[in-house]
A protein has these predicted regions:
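N-terminal low-complexity, acidic/polar interaction/targeting segments
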Residues: 1-194
Length: 194
């Protein structure tokens, strides 16, 4: 399947949500096509220290997103809210006539639901706390799934300021067990702000 690709510093995983500002004509075309086809588009993780002009590679795993809301902003900008649908593996990328990236991709597995336990409930509690502290983030989720560690871990992976290659390592796993261990260790570190 061929799907438009948007490299972005906002990292999004299945069931995650983000608000994006779309400015370039090629990306506005991407949004129009995503809305008319119901195929969505891909959001590929790039680290915040990389400029779009220097992107020569994107991670193999990327999230397909659907647009759940949009509105016009000042200055001919477009504001959209997207939600992650699934994970796809990029096989090949080509550049379209207007420099929009188009990816040939194949389905990849997504983590199954994974129930919270007394041992890992700490992660859900800290995420609730983060959502209360950062209302713009918390308001994106009208029905948060704090009892599902897959959902909780994916939200943490999206927001934590860790290198994209480590995020990719975590999402390459067949379930969230490694992510739970990693996040428990990271979030229980007293030097971490959260």
């Amino acid at each position: 399947m061929k799907i438009p690709l948007l490299p972005h510093t906002d990292h999004l995983l299945p069931k995650g949500r983000a608000k994006l500002t779309i400015a370039q004509a090629r990306h506005i075309r991407m949004v129009k096509e995503a809305l008319s086809s119901n195929e969505g588009f891909l959001m590929a993780m790039i680290d915040s220290n990389r400029e779009e002009s220097e992107i020569t590679e994107v991670p193999a795993l990327t999230t397909r997103v659907q647009i759940i809301d949009f509105h016009r902003l000042e200055g001919d900008l477009l504001g959209i809210t997207v939600e992650g649908i699934d994970i796809l593996r990029i096989m090949k990328i080509h550049v379209d006539f207007d420099h929009l990236l188009i990816a040939d991709c194949a389905p990849y597995f997504i983590w199954p639901p994974f129930p919270a336990t007394s041992e890992n409930q700490y992660l859900a509690d800290k995420l609730k706390q983060l959502h209360a502290t950062v209302p713009d983030l918390g308001e994106l989720y009208t029905e948060p799934k704090y009892s599902d560690m897959t959902w909780v871990c994916q939200r943490w992976i999206e927001v934590l300021p860790i290198d994209g290659k480590y995020k990719q390592l975590l999402i390459h796993q067949e379930n969230p067990k490694l992510a739970i261990r990693f996040l428990m260790k990271l979030l229980q570190d007293k030097n971490l702000i959260y």
